[in-house]
Amino acid sequence: MADTTGRIPLWIIGTVAGILVIGLIGIFFYGSYSGLGSSL
């Protein structure tokens, strides 16, 4: 597992993807709760 030079490690991709998904879900629920996300 030493040839990860030049590529992004898979765990970084998974972590970033998880944060983005959680952020998008949080924004969606917050927007729909406050009445601003009805256009989404």
UniProtKB/Swiss-Prot annotation:
InterPro entries: PSII_PsbJ (IPR002682), PSII_PsbJ_sf (IPR037267). Its main location: plastid. One of its GO terms (biological process) is photosynthesis. Disruption phenotype: Able to assemble functional PSII, however electron flow is deregulated; forward flow from Q(A) to plastoquinone is slower while reduction of the oxygen evolving complex is faster, loss of light-activated, redox-dependent phosphorylation of LCHII, plants senesce quickly. Plants are hypersensitive to light, cannot grow photoautotrophically and have drastically reduced oxygen-evolving capacity. Dramatic reduction in PSI subunits, almost complete loss of PsbP, a subunit of the oxygen-evolving complex. It is found in: Plastid, Chloroplast thylakoid membrane. GO terms for cellular component: chloroplast thylakoid membrane; photosystem II reaction center. Pfam families: PsbJ (PF01788). The chain crosses the membrane at residues 8-28. It is a single-pass membrane protein. PANTHER family: PHOTOSYSTEM II REACTION CENTER PROTEIN J. One of the components of the core complex of photosystem II (PSII). Essential for PSII function, it may be important for unidirectionality of electron flow and/or assembly of the oxygen evolving complex. PSII is a light-driven water:plastoquinone oxidoreductase that uses light energy to abstract electrons from H(2)O, generating O(2) and a proton gradient subsequently used for ATP formation. It consists of a core antenna complex that captures photons, and an electron transfer chain that converts photonic excitation into a charge separation. NCBIfam families: PRK02565.1. HAMAP family: PSII_PsbJ. This is Photosystem II reaction center protein J. The gene is psbJ.
